[in-house]
Swiss-Prot record:
Subcellular location: Cytoplasm
Positions contributing to S-adenosyl-L-methionine binding: T152, G172, D194, N234
Lineage, highest ranks first: Bacteria, Pseudomonadati, Thermodesulfobacteriota, Desulfuromonadia, Geobacterales
GO terms, molecular function: protein methyltransferase activity; protein-lysine N-methyltransferase activity
Top-level division of the source organism's lineage: Bacteria
GO cellular component: cytoplasm
Protein family according to the UniProt entry: Belongs to the methyltransferase superfamily. PrmA family.
Enzyme class, first EC level, given as a word: transferase
EC number annotated for this UniProt entry: 2.1.1.-
Name of the protein in question: Ribosomal protein L11 methyltransferase
CDD domains: AdoMet_MTases
Principal location: cytoplasm
Free-text function comment from the UniProt entry: Methylates ribosomal protein L11.
GO biological process, one term: methylation
Length: 299
């Protein structure tokens, strides 16, 4: 049977988060998680701080949960005054299965066909390719990009329709999935860049797994030399618009820019943001709540 955990959830003043997290790690002997805000950007510059945050801790349910909760309530009561004085809601306890907590995502990651010939295959799953299939083996680790997310899928579909590119730049490479696909589709030179050094390590492992050569860097976009036949950026609307000038400058004459990570409700915002980029919008595709825009440098 799957192991179970008692998930204790505390909503506390933002200033108390670090102190509480340390206390809960000590008390539970396990890690804690702090809920992320749903932001449309990877950059925190100019983002207003929230007043409260949610901290979750994980206990073995066989332990004395009533005793643990009493200790947590005492800790919250002792600290409430120092952090605004408002009463802190009582922690809630939910029983969850281990698979939900740590590795549940693996169940949903099965070999997936995308476009006509691309197949994304988890390293641990068997798969019998059909003639012409381009199989990408992947273990995303903690980096984003299994191909199961619509933003990645939309990018891969758009990339395949553009035929065989020569030079490709993958901005925000994550697991390296788009960069590897570009090589599989025949690109001669591919550069993948990410602001997250851990993502670059995972991307490197995935490139090695697939026997493909991709130059992986953490170099800021503006400092990457040259122009590319295809520039891919599956980031988020705010970031794409902020980077519009640098992204457009990297597209060679006759080349394409594929933008993804855009909630459809933010599509108009991105179209407007690229209005003065000098590129022409040539295709829009959508899946679920996500949009993907393809621009062309007509110059
Ligand atoms: C949504 S993931 C995309 C991963 C993968 N390319 C895919 O399509 O599945 C976005 C990635 O962009 C990276 N990122 C965010 N802002 C960036 C920036 N300004 N320059 C480069 N990478 C960035 C993040 O660290 C993250 O790995």
């Amino acid at each position: 049977m799957d192991k179970q955990w008692a998930e204790v959830c505390c909503q506390v003043p933002a200033g108390l988060v670090d102190l509480l997290a340390d206390f809960l790690v000590e008390l539970s002997g396990n890690g804690v998680s702090i809920d992320n805000r749903a932001l449309d950007t990877f950059t925190l510059d100019g983002i207003e701080e929230l007043d409260t945050a949610t901290v979750r801790a994980y206990f073995d349910p066989a332990t004395d949960m009533a005793g643990q909760i009493a200790q947590i309530e005492r800790f919250l009561g002792d600290n409430a005054a120092a952090f605004g004085g408002a009463p802190i809601p009582a922690p809630t306890v939910t029983l969850i299965r281990d698979e939900d907590w740590a590795t549940g995502w693996r169940q949903h990651f099965v070999p997936t066909r995308i476009g006509r010939h691309l197949v994304i295959k988890p390293t641990w799953e068997p798969f019998a390719p059909e003639p012409g299939d381009q199989v990408i083996e992947l273990d995303p680790g903690m980096a984003f990009g299994t191909g199961t997310h619509p933003t990645t899928r939309l990018c891969l579909e758009a990339l395949e329709t553009l035929g065989r590119p020569d030079r490709v730049l993958d901005v925000g490479t994550g697991s390296g999935i788009l960069a590897i696909a570009a090589v599989r589709l025949g690109a001669r030179q591919v550069i993948g860049t990410d602001i997250d050094p851990d993502a670059v390590i995972v991307a490197g492992e995935n490139c090695a797994l697939n026997g493909v050569e991709v130059e992986l860097v953490t170099t800021p976009l503006a400092l990457i030399p040259g122009r590319f036949d295809v520039v891919l950026a599956n980031i988020l609307a705010e970031d794409l618009v902020r980077m519009a000038g640098d992204l457009a400058a990297k597209v060679a004459a006759g080349g394409h820019l594929i933008l993804s990570g855009i909630l459809t409700e933010r599509e108009a915002f991105v179209v407007e943001g690229f209005g003065r980029s000098g590129l022409a919008l040539v295709a829009v595709s959508r899946e679920g709540e996500w949009s993907c825009l393809v621009y062309r440098n007509e110059g």
